[in-house]
């Protein structure tokens, strides 16, 4: 059972819809009345300004036509003549003042200080933001080199050659000159033939002594152990394999053949 539309606070209720429409109509009427008052005030101000201007224009001939010796019934104005003749009033250059005003307005617009009523932030800027520019105009003036230009520069052999030449020039400039280089030590004089011969004889004598000592050690072991045993060819009678101490390996036990019956 759908009872939601039956609620009094429902937005689609007939009473609420009618109330909203009535409020909208009242708001439109109030807006129209406000605009009418603004227009009426502007019209009255313009009319008053024109009336004052007409009075000032007609007051000068009346003063000239009046007798200067006749006493006036109003208060005495000592500065009337100066104001009428525009004397003593500093006059500025209108063009210069207008130019200064435009320059100040341009600076304030560039800084974002001066914004008019109803003007958005994008309109206040001198140049539209990047997200409002069309695709073609975004890429027309990129801040840096484009990807295609980077690839061309990387694959250009002339650019590569210039880079290597610049490195070579830099290394040659950083390398010290011949005068600044430290003088290398002169190589020693080659040894004489007698010295080389003596060294060779000394090495040969040392090798010969080492070989004789080795042979003497082997012969001494043979004399102590006696005659060297002949190498056994039978696999069953050979000693067990011992990599480090073959003399300590024992023979396998000999098996006596069984007599045949």
Curated annotation (Swiss-Prot):
User: Where does the sequence pass through the membrane?
Assistant: none
**The organism's place on the tree of life at top rank:** Eukaryota
Pfam families for this protein: Cir_N
Q: Give the keywords, sorted.
A: Coiled coil, Phosphoprotein
What is the protein named?
Answer: Leukocyte receptor cluster member 1 homolog
Sequence ranges of Basic and acidic residues compositional bias:
12-38, 78-109, 147-163, 171-211
Q: Gene of origin?
A: Leng1
Q: Where is this region: Disordered?
A: 1-261
- The coiled-coil regions, if any, are 16-46, 192-222
InterPro entries assigned to the protein according to its UniProt record, in alphabetical order: CIR_N_dom (IPR019339), LENG1-like (IPR039875)
Ranges of Low complexity composition bias in the record:
212-228
- Mind telling me which SMART domains this protein's record contains? Cir_N
Q: Which residues are recorded with the post-translational modification Phosphoserine?
A: 59, 242
